[in-house]
Amino acid sequence: DMGKERLYLKPESFYHENKIKLRLGLTVKKINRIKKLIETDSVTYDYDQLILTTGSLPNQFPGNFGKNLSGIYYIRNLDDADKLKEIFEPGKTALILGGGYIGLEGAAVARLKDLNVIVVEKSKRILNRVACEQTSNYFRKLHQDNNVKIVEGYGVDRFTHQNGKINGVF
């Protein structure tokens, strides 16, 4: 297992040394571009240069499509990924919906933990929205060489379940 620090683009000291003030996990309520002020729930900040890195939310299944079933996890950050360490059991199967960078990284970690892994990507190829075809081909081969099954061009319509646990995917 590698430490979380190795996953960050820069160490925390980089930001301090370069006089960059990080404000993480805040909800910005208002930006005044004329006065160069940012208003959050509790504090107002002034700024010289503003860089918005808003992150994103994972695609969620609509309605009751699996929301109350055990075994469905959404991953968007390191804390989400850490929670999976507890449930990864060698020999179990991980079905990963989404063949972007986060999904492929999850697949790699699951294989390192000796899980059987299937990645389902609804686009025509993995990394379709973020990389060229050659990059997709490289990562497809890398994952397949490490026994990850990749299914492209198919989405998931529904789960079947019994006693609150998934027992089929269509």
Question: Residue locations for each model-derived region?
Answer:
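FAD-binding core/adjacent interface of flavoenzyme oxidoreductases
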Residues: 8-95, 158, 168-170
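Alpha-helical segments flanking ligand/cofactor-binding loops in enzyme cores
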Residues: 13, 108, 140-141
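Glycine-rich phosphate-binding loop and adjoining beta1-alpha1-beta2 segment
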Residues: 1-8
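Short polybasic/polar patches that bind polyanions
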Residues: 16-18, 111, 144
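Glycine-rich, phosphate-binding/catalytic loops in enzymes
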Residues: 1, 67-71, 113, 136
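Rossmann-like NAD(P)H-binding beta-loop-alpha module
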Residues: 83-131
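A Rossmann-like FAD-binding core segment of flavoenzymes
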Residues: 23-39, 45, 113-170
